[in-house]
Amino acid sequence: MISTQYLIPTYWHRCSISEQLTLLTRPINKHNNSIHLDVKYILDHVSKLGDNALIKFNLQFDYVNTISLKISPNKIINSGNSLSKPIKKAIHSAIDNITRFHTAQYFPKVDLEIIPGVRCKQIIRPLHTIGLYVPGGSTPLPSTVMMLGIPAKIAQCKRIILCSPPPIPNIILYTAQLCGIEEIYQVGGAQAIAAMGFGTESIPRVDKIFGPGNIWVTEAKRQIHYITNKVAIDMLAGPSEILIIADKTANPIFIAADLLSQAEHGPDSHIILITPDMNLAQQTRQELYKQIQNLDRIDIIHQSLTHARIIITDNIMECFQISNDYAPEHLLIQTQNPENYLKYITNAGSIFLGHWSPESAGDYASGTNHVLPTYGHATTTSALGVADFQKRILVQELTQHGLLQLSSTIQTLTKIEKLKAHEYSVIHRINYIKGTT
């Protein structure tokens, strides 16, 4: 039974500013010097020894003696043979939905005549070589393959490689194949990030690394980005978060289930319910006690609930003010007419509107991406999408007439900034046009 000292509803306006800040403080991110040094050791070895270091670390950390790091095409092709029809059907359905939503994200071309003789364009080019990291662990994560692989394929990246700890389950290989990924390597952890960041005899150096992972993977991404100054990363993943805003129309059974769906991710998961209805808060609290008894990861959930919060506000609008300050990874709005509140939301990774929109839908099959900013980064960072696998290149073309039109503006501004060479790059052309060179 979960301790009754947890999840005690707190009235927001009865708290001091300091207490309010504490209520919204996330669990401390477990980053310490020991992890930094461990990861640095791994990165140094992979940088110097290449594939030999990867084979060594596979044996050391995953207890697998890998003769070949690359998964053979034949194994990928046959990976679906051991999967049941319902599993294949679910994967296909999710891929269809995710593909449809992400295809709609494709950047439109911009081609505009600003003034006569001055044309500006924005052209889109895919990243050439990208690396996808899919964590291992006690259960396979085919959804991560989809969330990374589908937008990469839509963006038309030229070379997509995937790394995952050995032995890689068939369901991961099958899902990757359906997402158009053919280059798969059995290597995990910080060493996989190092391989993609530096390149080895087997694994190419990539332009950008995508994918979640544990604290060692996250630290490896941080260090690789800093060391190479060339390899980009998608984002630094933190513990999972959910914030639910609910009114009296909400169902406490649904709320409890949604909160627990995030609590089971890990002991550092942060779950918050904000409501103006104390009765709903108490009902949800009791429902949490009931539902947790039927779940598998009870110890993890218990740890997560030690820093869970139920906040009582004076009105529904105050809920959104608090949520914007917190900037949650997942924001669920379980109220009457939830779409009316969208205009008040400024900070959130992904929003789930209404009583029939569980967070699990976005995690797997609604079509949106589940790679989202955490730890308050939703104030400045967006969910993963097709744009993250592309770059925008700007083009401008001026005719003689166009340059004559702009010349006085350019020269005036270059004089203000005292950049004479800039000014003369225009003057020489104007003189040529006027025949005075």
Curated annotation (Swiss-Prot):
Its cofactor is Zn(2+). One of its GO terms (molecular function) is NAD binding. PROSITE patterns: HISOL_DEHYDROGENASE. The active site is at residues 329-330. The keyword Cell membrane does not apply. NAD(+) binds at residues 133, 191, 214. It is an enzyme of class 1 (oxidoreductase). Zn(2+) binds at residues 262, 265, 363, 422. The keyword Metal-binding applies. It comes from the Bacteria. One of its GO terms (biological process) is L-histidine biosynthetic process. Its EC number is 1.1.1.23. Binds 1 zinc ion per subunit. One of its GO terms (cellular component) is cytosol. It catalyses: L-histidinol + 2 NAD(+) + H2O = L-histidine + 2 NADH + 3 H(+). Pathway: Amino-acid biosynthesis; L-histidine biosynthesis; L-histidine from 5-phospho-alpha-D-ribose 1-diphosphate: step 9/9. SUPFAM superfamilies: ALDH-like. Catalyzes the sequential NAD-dependent oxidations of L-histidinol to L-histidinaldehyde and then to L-histidine. Homodimer. Belongs to the histidinol dehydrogenase family. NCBIfam families: hisD (TIGR00069). PANTHER family: HISTIDINE BIOSYNTHESIS TRIFUNCTIONAL PROTEIN (PTHR21256:SF2), HISTIDINOL DEHYDROGENASE HDH (PTHR21256). This is Histidinol dehydrogenase. The lineage of its organism: Bacteria, Pseudomonadati, Pseudomonadota, Gammaproteobacteria, Enterobacterales.
